């Protein structure tokens, strides 16, 4: 298996950038597009465990659009072969004033319709 094929890495990096832009702008349509529409897709959030695309979609639709802006740091995207990738990043929000750091990991898989997130985990810890 080849790791970090340049063309595949570029594709996933572009999709990750689309996700980040959609997230901070609360573009729910793009966020929904980027998660796999499947009952096995999951997202472990800061305060919720979401099982299945429908639960993820409902969470996004109900979430407040206020306070979503963030900056990312130490983003690492690794591809495995041509159809699987993991994206990991740290993120910060101004409201945290340096006291907390968020962590996000996503597993991406290439399907006929394109790259989709099949699993995601978001958490926040105190910054030391």
Where are these predicted regions, by residue range?
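C-terminal-biased regions
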Residues: 1-7, 68-69, 84-85, 116
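Hydrophobic pocket/interface hotspot
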Residues: 19, 31-32, 40-41, 52, ...
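Short beta-strand edge/turn micro-motifs at domain boundaries
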Residues: 101-128
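Short beta-strand segments enriched in hydrophobic/aromatic residues
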Residues: 35, 91-93, 121-124
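Short, low-complexity N-terminal intrinsically disordered segments enriched in polar/charged residues
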Residues: 1-37, 128
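Surface-exposed, charged secondary-structure patches
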Residues: 11, 46, 55-98
């Amino acid at each position: 298996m080849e790791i970090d094929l340049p063309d595949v890495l570029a594709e996933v990096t572009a999709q990750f950038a689309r996700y980040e832009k959609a997230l901070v702008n609360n573009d729910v349509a793009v966020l929904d597009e980027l998660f796999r529409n499947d009952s096995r897709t999951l997202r472990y959030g800061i305060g919720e465990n979401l099982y299945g695309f429908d639960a993820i979609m409902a969470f996004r639709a109900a979430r407040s659009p206020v306070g979503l802006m963030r900056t990312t740091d130490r983003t690492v995207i690794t591809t495995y072969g041509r159809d699987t990738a993991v994206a990991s990043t740290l993120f910060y929000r101004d409201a945290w004033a340096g006291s907390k750091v968020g962590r996000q990991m996503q597993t991406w898989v290439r399907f006929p319709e394109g790259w989709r997130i099949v699993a995601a985990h978001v958490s926040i810890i105190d910054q030391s």
